[in-house]
Amino acid sequence: VAATVAVGAVGAAVRLSQDDDPKLRPGGALALSADDGSDVAALETGLRLQERSSGVLQSEALPTSTYSMAAVTWARPEDRPEVLVRARRSDGWSDWTRLPVVEDRPDDDPAVRTGTAAWWFGPSDAVQVRLSRGPAPKGMRLVLLHPASRPDDELSPRTAARRSTGTPKAPRPDIRTRKQWGADESWRDGSPRTNRTIEQVHVHHTVSGNTYSRKETAALIRGMYRYHTKSLGWSDIGYNFLVDRFGRIWEGRAGGIAQPVRGAHTLGFNDTSMGVSVIGNFEQAAPTEAIIDALGALAAWKLDAYDRRPRGKTTVESTGSDKYAAGRMATLRVIDGHRDTNDTACPGSKLYARLDDVRDRAHRVIKASRAGRPVDEPEEPEVVGVVEPARVGGVAKPGKGLKVLKGRYDPDGARSSYQWLRDGDPIAGETAWRYRLGQADLGRRIAVQVTTRSGSRT
């Protein structure tokens, strides 16, 4: 069975298909290795693709040492292949996952490479790549990453929220620093650049998967940082800040969290803005209230320092994007989505639809600080942590059965309930951990939503 973990609450899904389990090529596995002193193992290698059907190119199934993130890069930004990757995990091959092209990039560095998002598959030991739309771009390379978790990834304290003693301003929310997520400062190149002002906050998503646990977040950011600097050739991680799916804020690009550091996140508009990216894919998943609260609190703090109105608009000059030519004036929302400035689906339709809520949250924070009232930062919600996500097992054919391969959660002993879905709609009465497939399921996407609770935690 090809299985992928879905999004939202914990979920898993399969699509019925005739694709057989691929046979691995003979020979040794591709081996990842880490630089001296680094805990991020990596491998970059050329790809040999063969035509499988009209217009479809595919690699062999390649055995590897353990990796958890995969991406594909190439030389020319004008090339736009449709890249799909699947990974072999402990429960078998994943479904094919489309890796979107990274639309974030520096404004003024033509030497950087182009590539897909680095997708979080979790621990895997084989990989296969497919191009559904060719030809293959020049200089195509497979990138595999395995950022190891550290014992102290969840032990580092957050930065304390700062409260101004002068003119009331929106308070700084809790932010985990680069040191706390383990940035190797030797990877970045040159000194940070700062902007004159901050006119906007651009909201992104990393399109890197939604199945990471709280304890895996710092390692995932280290892997993303390694990919941005070593594989794509950027001077640093592209985003000024990141927000994880649990509502925690992390420092991104170096230069000081209180400074207007120039990032590499919104082509054509990096010199007048701050960029924040939510870790995950929000074309698939809806953002939690913890994410919306974190985005609002962060935007309020950064914008209020420059007297910007979170619910307003501003007019800025583009330095050149695929939507606004260099020198063109653009009137945009002060808090906008990446798609407002560039030809991209970022930050995903489900997160984009919540940007008004982010604006309202930021407005309320600023209004409260103006009135001299204390602004309580939203508490991190008590949630059940996903140590190992649930998977789908079984045989994906009519007359056969699927079952939930139960995950591991924090705390131990959390109880799970199930709802099977057909093309996203609940299947009446199917709430057991097993599901028998019928003819009505042929060619349909069958998923299971797994909701796990422990007391008041979900």
Question: What are the roles of these predicted feature ranges?
Answer:
Residues 9-42, 370:
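C-terminal region of N-terminal signal peptides and the immediate post-cleavage residues
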Residues 64-70, 80, 198:
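Extended extracellular/luminal ectodomain segments enriched in beta-structured repeat modules
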Residues 75-80, 124, 134-135, 409-415:
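Short proline/glycine-enriched turn/loop motifs at strand-loop junctions of beta-rich domains
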Residues 376-458:
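Ser/Thr/Pro/Gly-rich low-complexity disordered regions
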Residues 187, 195-231:
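Active-site acidic/histidine clusters and adjacent loop/turn architecture
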Residues 9-18, 135, 139-206, 238, ...:
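Basic/polar, cationic surfaces and motifs that engage anionic cell-wall
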Residues 8-13, 58-66, 82-84, 89, ...:
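Beta-sandwich interaction modules
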Residues 1-2:
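N-terminal export leaders
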